[in-house]
């Protein structure tokens, strides 16, 4: 059995006095594709940022900090604090929920930013090699944007821009991908294409994926596992069909859901108001 790629022990996240996640014990092994689900404000973005190492995990966090994390997070068996940023960037990649383009750049230039851990350092700074450009073009092709390399990202639609962000994460070529709502702006067939691509990444050697998603049925179809937050500190983790059940999701989202079946297909649907 492979060693966990990512692991948390007693991870607790707080926003001021509110507990977002209480005592999370999570093990993510190579080959697994995890969906992170839960209502708005449950802490999904905060959790992904914490797993990525964007905030310190401290057993004695500052009392008045707006967001705090305590417990333990390890990637590849090493605590986050022990990773050098340059080395960590070759192991995990994070796709944020929103991207704001302060100035124009081509899609290829944006995707090349995902290659920053590998850029050759020269006297005048870091420069892309032919291999970096090839990796970026391959990533654009993987999201169906090979013809958009020269397009200014400020001229793209929301869905096209989101696919460029996904390409940048793929170009970073890390075993662990953390993605915050990576398909929220995509139409259905691009959602399916993107989730199939993430699933193939998880199936590769020593790789895993964690993505947040509000579409529970897409998550049930493409994820192998799920982490469900209830917005009150509670959580459930395990195989996706066990966790994203009508009972558990009804409790987490505060609205009754029911599971319908059509042969081998299943779907969660909202129950009618009575």
Protein language model annotation of sequence segments:
Residues 64-87:
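ABC ATPase NBD Q-loop/coupling interface
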Residues 52:
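Helix-to-loop junction immediately C-terminal to a conserved catalytic motif
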Residues 246, 250-274:
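ABC ATPase nucleotide-binding domains
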Residues 112, 127-148:
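Conserved ABC ATPase "signature" region
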Residues 37-39:
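The feature captures the beta-strand-to-loop junction immediately N-terminal to the Walker
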């Amino acid at each position: 059995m492979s060693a966990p790629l990512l692991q948390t022990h007693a991870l607790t996240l707080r926003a001021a006095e509110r507990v977002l996640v209480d005592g999370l014990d999570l093990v993510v092994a190579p080959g697994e594709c995890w969906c992170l689900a839960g209502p708005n404000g449950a802490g999904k973005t905060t959790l992904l940022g914490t797993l990525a190492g964007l905030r310190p995990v401290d057993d004695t966090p500052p009392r008045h900090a707006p967001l705090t994390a305590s417990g333990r997070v390890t990637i590849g068996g090493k605590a986050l604090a022990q990773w050098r940023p340059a080395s960590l960037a070759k192991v995990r990649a994070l796709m944020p929920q929103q991207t704001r383009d302060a100035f124009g750049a081509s899609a290829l230039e944006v995707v090349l930013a995902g290659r920053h851990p590998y850029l050759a350092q020269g006297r005048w700074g870091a420069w892309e090699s032919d291999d970096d450009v090839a990796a970026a073009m391959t990533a654009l092709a993987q999201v169906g944007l090979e013809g958009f390399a020269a397009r200014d990202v400020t001229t793209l639609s929301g869905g096209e821009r989101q696919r460029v962000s996904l390409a940048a994460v793929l170009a970073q070529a890390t075993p662990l991908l953390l993605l915050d709502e990576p398909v929220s702006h995509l139409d259905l067939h691009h959602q399916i294409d993107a989730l199939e691509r993430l699933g193939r990444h998880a199936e590769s050697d020593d790789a895993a994926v964690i993505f947040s998603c509000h579409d529970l049925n897409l998550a049930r179809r493409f994820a192998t596992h799920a982490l469900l937050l209830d917005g009150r500190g509670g959580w459930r983790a395990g195989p996706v069909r066990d966790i994203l059940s009508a009972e558990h999701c009804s409790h987490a989202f505060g609205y009754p859901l029911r599971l319908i079946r059509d042969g081998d297909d299943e779907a969660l649907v909202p129950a009618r108001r009575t």
